Amino acid sequence: IIRAEGVSIRYITGDFKDIGLKEYVLRKLTGNYQVKEFWADWDVTFELEKGDMLGIVGTNGAGKSTLLKAISGIMVPTRGKIQTNGTVAALLELTSGFDGDLTVRENTYLRGALLGYTRAFMDQMYDEIISFAELQDFQERPFKQLSSGMKSRLAFSIASLVNPDILILDEVLSVGDGSFRQKSGNKMREILANGVTGILVSHSIDQVRELCNKVLWLDHGKQMDFGGTQEVCDRYEAFMQRKK
């Protein structure tokens, strides 16, 4: 259901998008213009079947979030290709796809529309989404007035309750209080039991071991390992111990 073949993603720093058009022209005129290439991911290859849960591990700057953006269709790989079959619900940044001035109710429908769902479908799911997010008393509150925990609960509830084929989570399960983390973990297990394919980025190895059956280990953009959870997590933890 997901196949990545030789995926490499390059950023170019110092072009006019980074420094502004005026500064770009000045640097070109004075001969002080330089661009630098940065490869966030390099030659990443893996394949997931229906119902797999992939954990992506690695330190900050490993290229995890960049890879998720490519899998979600937000970015196009510089090299290689990614194939996904089915609807994708991605929680990469908790506030993306929300409007701070709109209410919780309005944002729920907005986020649903961005995920490709009809108004009628969201009408059916709305009460369940709000109940799972524990936001019954905040439905008419502007989104910007919610705490970060409330925002994360709403984002996770929408993504997990609208029945995607592929669910992508970037550190989402680590946000919120303990009781909601437990509830969201239980929901993830229920989702996987129903055949949804998931990808989880987490700094919690315990969480990856508990929820994932496959693991991809990235380090400075390079694929270090891909395979079964226990084997890859053991090698990753041994690697991190040696670095200390």
Where do the PLM segments sit?
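H-loop/switch region of ABC-family ATPase nucleotide-binding domains
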Residues: 202-203
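A short, surface-exposed alpha-helical micro-motif characterized by mixed small hydrophobic
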Residues: 208-210
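Conserved ABC ATPase "signature" region
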Residues: 22-29, 109, 121-138, 157
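The feature captures the beta-strand-to-loop junction immediately N-terminal to the Walker
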Residues: 57-59
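Conserved ABC ATPase "signature" C-loop
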Residues: 220-221, 236
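ABC ATPase "signature
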Residues: 226-227
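Pre-NBD coupling/linker segments of ABC/ABC-like ATPases
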Residues: 1-40, 230-243
